[in-house]
Amino acid sequence: MAYTQSKSQKVGYQAGVKDYRLTYYTPDYTPKDTDILAAFRVTPQPGVPFEEAAAAVAAESSTGTWTTVWTDLLTDLDRYKGCCYDIEPLPGEDNQFIAYIAYPLDLFEEGSVTNMLTSIVGNVFGFKALKALRLEDLRIPVAYLKTFQGPPHGIQVERDKLNKYGRPLLGCTIKPKLGLSAKNYGRAVYECLRGGLDFTKDDENINSQPFQRWRDRFLFVADAIHKAQAETGEIKGHYLNVTAPTCEEMLKRAEFAKELEMPIIMHDFLTAGFTANTTLSKWCRDNGMLLHIHRAMHAVMDRQKNHGIHFRVLAKCLRMSGGDHIHTGTVVGKLEGDKAVTLGFVDLLRENYIEQDRSRGIYFTQDWASMPGVMAVASGGIHVWHMPALVDIFGDDAVLQFGGGTLGHPWGNAPGATANRVALEACIQARNEGRDLMREGGDIIREAARWSPELAAACELWKEIKFEFEAQDTI
């Protein structure tokens, strides 16, 4: 039987393909306080108008598809569609611009970073009309933030648990990252903690391999921590990596860490996924466990200036999903990181209210609605000569993590830890006395080295080591 369309059915619907900009480019739209706002860096294919490319991003990341569909008549399209409300040309870039898109809150499941990212970045990055696309920033409305738990504990609760105030915390990643037996691994942990560090850490790819099963590592590390605490009188910790093939196995490892009375565990939030991370974060709050987050795989998404997802977006997503620490780069070490950009997303992790500041890459004012902050972790190619700059750049609410800068000390692990602790204490004292760490940092370290042979040896070993490469991710 042939289908015949009535006259009434023809009204308001016409099959076919039409330009995205006719529906999704809405320069007269005023964003609502409840909208999620996105800033995309768009590079369209040659010949594609800016308005059409921007509207295509809005459509494909919300309600649109490539052709008109009659089921649009069964919903309120104007209520649910993403709206490109502004286009901002980029100086010096002929075929690149920033597209500002507003998404109605009802498009997203409450408390789900997974669903939010699936919608906003899940499909549109493969769109043929675009040569490249990068999500630069998101504005998360308070109405949506209130559906998330956020970090298990936050900065202040962590300090109260550790009874450590007025300075950054010191950490160390155990090296070599792979190949040590569990017993030798525990020995290295003990030596570093006894020497003066607050934390030691599993590297991101230590899970449960043939040379070192997770349960054995946990047992030897727990023994090392209890011994170091008894000798130093300080609370110590080790980031036990509970990242696992399944969520069930992840929680099993977390439970065992709790049985051993460990204060903190660790998770690789990108490789494991946001669903697993949010699950673990909620478990940590319920069980009084701090959660350290490693960002393994982040540079796959955020390193290229024109395509991917900027780390400030990943940082916001992590704060929502939950974590008490996250690696942020160092500015001065071996890993990529422009100072202004890095401090921009460090503030987005730690502060409660951050104003728009394009000089630091912050496209939107962000109110975190009293959600606890996340402690920044500076890690990657740092040593004692970097200490003054690190303290000046990151302030107190950070973990300064020296892997090779501890274990590479010529006298061994414990002296390496002592050298870092002495350098940190000297910088904190100098700062509190009003000295300029950036201008006088070298003198401060040399003065401390006169009475600390461990620091003197470290200074001599690493005096020529620098990582001077131009940052790729700039404003």
Curated annotation (Swiss-Prot):
Active site: 175, 294
UniProt-listed GO biological process terms: photorespiration; reductive pentose-phosphate cycle
Sites where the protein binds substrate: 123, 173, 177, 295, 327, 379
Cofactor binding note: Binds 1 Mg(2+) ion per subunit.
PTM section of the record: The disulfide bond which can form in the large chain dimeric partners within the hexadecamer appears to be associated with oxidative stress and protein turnover.
Modified residue annotations for N6-carboxylysine: 201
Location relative to the cell: Carboxysome; Cytoplasm
Site residues (Transition state stabilizer), renumbered to this chain: 334
GO MF, one annotated term: monooxygenase activity
Cofactors: Mg(2+)
Cleavable signal peptide: none
Pfam families: RuBisCO_large (PF00016), RuBisCO_large_N (PF02788)
Reactions listed under catalytic activity: 2 (2R)-3-phosphoglycerate + 2 H(+) = D-ribulose 1,5-bisphosphate + CO2 + H2O; D-ribulose 1,5-bisphosphate + O2 = 2-phosphoglycolate + (2R)-3-phosphoglycerate + 2 H(+)
Task of the protein: RuBisCO catalyzes two reactions: the carboxylation of D-ribulose 1,5-bisphosphate, the primary event in carbon dioxide fixation, as well as the oxidative fragmentation of the pentose substrate in the photorespiration process. Both reactions occur simultaneously and in competition at the same active site.
Note from the entry: RuBisCO folding and assembly commences when the nascent large subunit folds with the help of chaperonin GroEL-GroES. Both RbcX and Raf1 help folded RbcL release from the chaperonin and dimerize. Dimeric Raf1 binds to RbcL(2) leading to an RbcL8-Raf1(8) complex. RbcS displaces Raf1, resulting in holoenzyme formation. The basic functional RuBisCO is composed of a large chain homodimer in a 'head-to-tail' conformation. In form I RuBisCO this homodimer is arranged in a barrel-like tetramer with the small subunits forming a tetrameric 'cap' on each end of the 'barrel'.
Family: Belongs to the RuBisCO large chain family. Type I subfamily.
Protein's UniProt name: Ribulose bisphosphate carboxylase large chain
Gene name of the encoded protein: cbbL
